[in-house]
């Protein structure tokens, strides 16, 4: 609720997992019931209610003399108008932690210089019956996506208590490892609004016991053996105690031919990793090497204190939006993100929708299917025309 002609920003915070999926441009329906003053003093044609989410503008709603919810208006007071509008929210505007923002801009009727007469108590509000309906969305996402992880802890926070998550710590713990672990669990709890009470903590030697869980691996390159063991799964490798881009496979070489920029991007990533030397602080997202239906995130560095550099990048509001893809390198007050590995999907889509999504994300396959379809149509047309031609010839040659 606000007061005055321009009451300032009215906000509402809400949390959800960031894996919302809506096919096409349908969006998520946000039904807004909003109340504002009635009277001859207000210029309804110029007044409006601006609606945004997470600082992204959605739509301006009109303020009319009579509301669409007239029966509610009569019950409340004849001095107020209750209106209702539905705004479609694009799913890519919805994150883990969200804020709906409403900005009333009331304009009075201009009578003359210094002659405007305004009521003493001008109030506006958003009705508590307003809703945002997420029930028609699917839960589906392409991973790895470190932006999901740093903003909402996804996919680990799918279970608020992290009961489906295991944290893999080094055998030889340092104070920085423990601090990183505690900071990270605090951030997870802040994302869900629930304490992390059911996560599992293991060391690298026992990681096979938690193969059915999503994994967060902590430790420096030297202290955490899983980094060397699992680097290949993220198109990386450990060489001489340093992280490097992995050797190209035959399939990678085929993609390089189709996309000449791929080789340049690989070189750029490798050069940046080499330039970090003993100051590397990095985070890697990948499909769990132990179970293809689960995910893993590795927070590592050249030394244990570099893990805290990664955590500090999470907390920095200026750096946080730059964390994306499946590899993030932090240092010198900046972060650089890349996508170097393969994507995989989590969640569920109906079969037809998933096929459309897959084709939409695989343009080469779509072109191939189109060519095959054209070829089939051409062959069928040729066969039909040939039969018609043969039929005509036979009818002409008949006595």
Language-model regions, residue ranges each:
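Solvent-exposed alpha-helical segments and adjacent loops
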Residues: 1-399
């Amino acid at each position: 609720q606000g007061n005055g002609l321009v009451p300032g920003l009215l906000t509402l915070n809400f949390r959800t997992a960031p894996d919302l999926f809506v096919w096409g441009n349908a969006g998520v329906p946000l039904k807004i019931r909003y109340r504002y003053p009635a009277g001859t003093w207000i210029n309804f044609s110029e007044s409006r209610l601006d609606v945004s989410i997470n600082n992204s503008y959605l739509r301006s709603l009109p303020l009319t003399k009579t509301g669409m919810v007239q029966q509610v208006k009569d019950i409340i007071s004849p001095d107020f108008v209750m209106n209702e509008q539905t705004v479609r929210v694009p799913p890519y505007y919805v994150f883990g932690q969200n804020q709906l923002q409403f900005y009333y801009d009331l304009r009075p009727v201009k009578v003359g210089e210094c002659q405007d007469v305004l009521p003493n108590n001008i109030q506006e509000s958003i009705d508590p019956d307003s809703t945002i309906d997420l029930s028609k969305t699917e839960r589906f996402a392409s991973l790895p996506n470190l932006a999901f992880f740093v903003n909402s802890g996804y996919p680990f926070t799918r279970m608020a208590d992290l009961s489906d998550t295991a944290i893999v710590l080094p055998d030889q713990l340092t104070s920085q490892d423990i601090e990183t672990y505690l900071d990270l669990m605090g951030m997870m709890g802040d994302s869900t609004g629930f304490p992390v009470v059911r996560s599992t903590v293991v060391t690298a030697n026992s990681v096979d016991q938690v193969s059915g869980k999503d994994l967060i691996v902590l430790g420096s390159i030297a202290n955490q053996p899983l980094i060397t063991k699992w680097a290949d799964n993220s198109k990386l490798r450990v060489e001489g105690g340093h992280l490097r881009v992995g050797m190209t496979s035959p399939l990678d070489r085929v993609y390089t031919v189709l996309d000449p920029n791929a080789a340049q991007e690989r070189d750029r990533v490798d050069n940046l990793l080499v330039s970090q030397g003993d100051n590397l602080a990095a985070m890697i997202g990948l499909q769990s090497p132990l179970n293809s239906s689960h995910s893993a995130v590795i927070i590592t560095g050249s030394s244990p204190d570099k893990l805290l550099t990664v955590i500090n990048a999470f907390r920095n509001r200026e750096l946080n939006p730059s964390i994306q893809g499946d590899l993030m390198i932090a240092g010198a007050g900046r972060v650089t993100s890349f996508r170097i590995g393969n994507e995989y999907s989590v969640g569920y889509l109906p079969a037809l929708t998933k096929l459309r999504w897959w084709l939409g994300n695989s343009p080469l396959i779509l072109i191939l299917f189109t060519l095959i379809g054209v070829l089939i149509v051409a062959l069928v047309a040729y066969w039909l025309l040939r039969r018609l031609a043969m039929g005509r010839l036979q009818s002409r040659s008949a006595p």
